[in-house]
Amino acid sequence: QTIQFQCSPYHTNTALYPAINFLRQAAGLLSQDSVGSQLNKLDAMAIENGIDNKETVSLLADLLSLREDHRYPPLNVSSEKHKDMTLEALIQHMHKLAYRCPVMCIVEDAHWLDPTTLDLITRIIGRIQQVRMLLLIAFRPDFKPVWSDYSHVTSLTLSRLPRRHSAELVTAITRGKVLPPEVQQAILAKADGVPLYIEALTESVLESKVMTEGNDSFTLKGPLKDLPIPDSLHALLMERVDRLGPTKEIVQTGAAIGREFSYDLIRGTVEMPDSQLRHALDLFVASGLIFQEGDIPLATYHFK
């Protein structure tokens, strides 16, 4: 099973923001659900994962701001003790998952971790050798976590792709069809070994209709200067968004929400018929701008 914690630059001071999103998705909670319905779903998830401690479920419910006093009365403890118990409840939940089957936990953009989630991740790493769990944490070089020196932690530095691997990525995107040498050279020179830039730039060139597609290769229709190669990855992505026409508002709204957004949230934000919204999201997924995880209405979308 895969668990994903997606950190956000807009929530660096929101305690346990990635964990809350994970729990909501895992339990299938929707904003239109009543508190009672959401608690029922949380209870069902706890039972499925073998969590029979009511205090643990109560702490998770409190973390999700689900409070029905008759079901889970508030705990009479200090705020610091409550925080400690909440972190332990989350760890217990993850350990129960790992007991059922091996778990891979991915923490994206850890340089945006809020302090409480950083505490949670540090505790998980401290005990990870006891459970069947692989923890993958991606972050920028300037982030210096305390656990980087732990003996059971391996650090990998992801450098720019060498030219040969960059060319292989271009070939994979063109599905084996050969680009004109001058076009491939322009892509590799501009992208400078950045995988996302290589991918987006190659896709942009293929979509621009400046080449004729043959059985095994592409032929440039005009001079190389007509090739659409923006000066930056940001400009390139904005150009691709502009091609979406009127529906680009959906992508722009999703980007304002963060690196990740749910179908439930985008539906409540964008004024558009449900069928039209679903069709637009399908087009965005097909274009490669976003990835979809899960099925609507529980779907979550991630930007590259």
Task: Give names to the regions the model predicted.
Residues Q1-L29, P102, H111-T116, I128, ...:
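Phosphate-binding active sites in nucleotide-utilizing proteins
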Residues F5, A19, L60, T86, ...:
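Conserved RecA-like P-loop NTPase ATPase core
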Residues Q6-P9, I137-D142, R160, L201-V205:
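A short beta-strand-to-loop transition that corresponds to the Sensor-1 phosphate-sensing loop
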Residues T12-M104, R132, S148-S151, L156, ...:
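Conserved Walker-type P-loop NTP-binding/catalytic site
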Residues A19-F22, L135, T157, H165-K304:
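Short secondary-structure boundary elements
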Residues H95, E108-D114, D119, I125-G126:
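Catalytic acidic motif of RecA-like/P-loop NTPases
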Residues C101-M104, D109, T300:
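The start of beta-strands in P-loop NTPase/AAA+ ATPase cores
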Residues L120-T157:
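Sensor-1/coupling segment of RecA-like P-loop NTPase cores
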